Amino acid sequence: MKSTSSGAFPPVPSQITIPVYAVTMAQTGETKIPASTPFYYAAISAIWVHFRVDPKVAQALLPRGLEVAVFDGAALASVHFMNALAQYGIGSPGNATTLPSPGGSVFNETEINIVALPSARAAAAPALTIEQFLAGGDQTKLLGNFRVWVACDDAVAVAAGKALYFENKILTSYGFNIPAMNNAGQSEYAWTCFENLTTTEVYSAKVDLAGLAALPANVSEWIDYSFDAEAQRPVASRRNYFGIFSSYDISNAQSAVAIAWGTSTLQMLTDMQALFGTAAPIAVQTFASPTVIAEAGPYYADV
């Protein structure tokens, strides 16, 4: 059939219409999947908002065996939001009752972190400034993020985080609009954490880095701390980001970040309010994994 256009390229709309579904899911049982460690992320986009906080308040949120890292009299805590993709290599048709049905999952989560180290190794703690630490200066790898709370919107990721990494992990929901290769023109990071499948907000955040200069940071490998409540021992794992972070000093541009508390009754919100209080953010870091495929726009092949 002859083309109705005399040009080389088909008309491509600026927006397309896609279906919207209301999806509900009830647990019908359980299944087994490989307890894979290391756990591999196929793709990730992440942002950290860092705060100087009161060491005494931070220490009160740490479990037995961990103590807060102190930088020039302050502790360092962060709100870490991520969009991630994991491929499990196991799938089943459609909306099957066996998870993970599509062979993978896209999950979004918040980690509320306090930089800490094992009490048993406190004497070996490096003397660093916050700026040195965020640039990747801790070569001892004793300093790491204790995950006070992890709030995730994927039930499989919640179960795996608890079983494999002893995370204090809960199921929540998210709405967000963040920079991405397929979200052209979006420069602001904006996200809201809700109590699971409700409109009750836990917290919301907006980060606008426009006009701010970024420095490269070699943060990996990143140490994550959790706690084995049964053994009453701290647990560590090492997370490698295969790339460079972008690090922003916002100590003189604190209006770049806005975080608002919701009305949730979850203990997570109570702890966030106690930890961060009215503290102003001092730094932001971002990381995005490289794009692996790009399919260019269409053109008429008969020219």
Residue ranges with predicted function:
Residues S3-K32, V150-V303:
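Interaction-surface and assembly-scaffold signal
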Residues G7-Y21, A26-G29, R64-A116, V284:
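A generic "folded-domain core" signal
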Residues I33-H80:
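N-terminal ordered "arm"
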Residues R52, R64, H80, R121, ...:
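Arginine residue identity/basic-tract feature
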Residues A58, A116, L266:
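Functionally constrained cores in energy, signaling, and assembly domains
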Residues L62-R64, G94, A163, K206:
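Surface-exposed beta-strand edges and their flanking turn/coil or helix-capping segments
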Residues Q87-T199:
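Aromatic- and glycine-enriched beta-alpha-beta binding-site module
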